[in-house]
């Protein structure tokens, strides 16, 4: 409900390590009419919270069951996605098995990579046979054109080149990166390497499930790099908006289906009310605006779910919620 009310028509969900609850999330997502990739989280290494650690063989078996049962449901817009939590929480055997599973069923893959410098060092120590974090995923068949990796704040030039070569994508999660002081992703540099990039929220790491917030934080991250003279120019608001829409669809390999209003694509849209009674910003009748463009710019900068009156997924109105959900 929260993600739909915030206007998210397509989501990538990390569920839990539990198969049945992950399947339930997929069922609920389908019932609400959202387009989504849902993943059963996999981790067989976890000293911090041992009760979350799975036995490798059981994890693989349960992931296979999750994929099989979800595919059998034949939901029109909800698909399984292979989800190793991240490198340090998985053994090499598990990563390899998950890569085989993704390859066998031609599935999408999601995980985290290079969120903070300590994580990068941990991966180097845990997997010394690999040149870098990206190679760990790549050699285990988890870095493909159907892969989306969150964060990527500390990728090297070589890793960005490998991302581009494989057609893998990055989900930029600036709210989380600021909140956890993980780092600042240089989006301009990523795009210059021809790596697909969309925006994410990393809820639990960040504090907002709103893509509007993700746009604002993306601008802040870009501005901070310009202030510190890392980049000569920052992103424009139009570029940040494109990353949240078409960029996200490209990251998920859905840009032939969604991402903009090109003829033939599915109609995903929000009806925006800039004059909502409880709007977080004010508009005045004397303001001389280019109504459509400027109103949208203000909405993106200052608005929130209170300004979203209706949400449509593939032409079907999903917000306000129907009485059946």
Where are these regions (language model features)?
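Metal-coordinating catalytic core of metallo-dependent amide/deamination hydrolases
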Residues: 20-154
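A conserved active-site cap/scaffold subdomain adjacent to cofactor or substrate pockets
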Residues: 157-158, 164-201
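Short, acidic/turn-prone active-site loops that include or flank metal/cofactor-
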Residues: 41-44, 115, 174-178, 203-205
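Short acidic/polar active-site loop segments enriched in Thr and Asp
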Residues: 9-10, 196
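Non-catalytic positions within long, well-ordered alpha-helices that form the structural scaffold/packing
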Residues: 1-4, 30, 164, 191
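C-terminal cap of metal-dependent C-N hydrolases
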Residues: 266-323
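His/Asp/Glu-enriched, well-ordered alpha-helical/loop segment
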Residues: 139-146, 188-284
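Divalent metal-coordination and catalytic microenvironments
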Residues: 7, 29, 82, 112, ...
